[in-house]
Amino acid sequence: KKISNHITKKVADRLEEIFKNDRPQFEEKWDSLKLFIQYGMLTDEKFYDRAVKFALFKDVEGKYFTFEEYKNLIKDNQTDKEGNLIYLYTTNKDEQYSYIQAAKDKGYSVLEMDGQLDVHLIGQLEQKFEKSRFVRVDSDTIDNLIRKEDSNKVTLSEEQKMAMQEVFKSQMPKLNKTEFYVTFEALGENANPVMLTQSEYMRRMREMSAMQPGMSFYGEMPDSFNFVLNTDHPLIKKVLTEEEQACDEKLKPILSDIKGWEARQADLREAQSKKKEDEITAQEKEDMT
């Protein structure tokens, strides 16, 4: 064990030396070194303690930061109303482009974390960093990822929500072991009309289960996605209006029949109220049912 500790110290000292003496070269080689350094941080507590001085984050712009540098960069703008520092990250810049842009539009920074051990490192850093959370940019709407204030209220009635859920669910693909849930957010008329998000917790558990046999339970669970409708957007409002108009057209003859039936019932009740019980015929009683 002493030999192992000595080797760990020598390796960490050498990496720190390179970082201090030639940081540009260290950054240039970081993508090649990252897997080795992250593995050491995850498996050796002493190596972690040394590595936090030179381990790097890389953002989507290709800039590198130490953990402390990045914390200082984002702390003023990416702290939520509960005092939690929120680290936004992406695992695929191309697939998650629109979500990254939504974060940038808010002035937020996004980390690129697409490595083999990044999901495990994230779990470790959340335990090490005080009042901090890592969330992927597509795991919720940007206002919910870093909640600065109470969300704008959705003004749809429960009946309108149910109708819109049916409209959109009817157009969704039927995929094996995949579930879609239609949800509603008031995101502003300039935000996207729809967004597809996936729970950070469940997605992370599924990713970790692929590498840890003991977590296979999560791997067997169906993928779950939220199809978020922005109720402030003109397109969503248009869909709602058209749905209500189409529904009204189909309901008109039914409502007319109901009103006619109610009028006949009222006339029968009035007529029967003037008769004694034994004067009401069997047919009249049947007409009231």
Set out the residue ranges of the language-model regions.
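Conserved GHKL (Bergerat-fold) ATPase module
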Residues: K1-T289
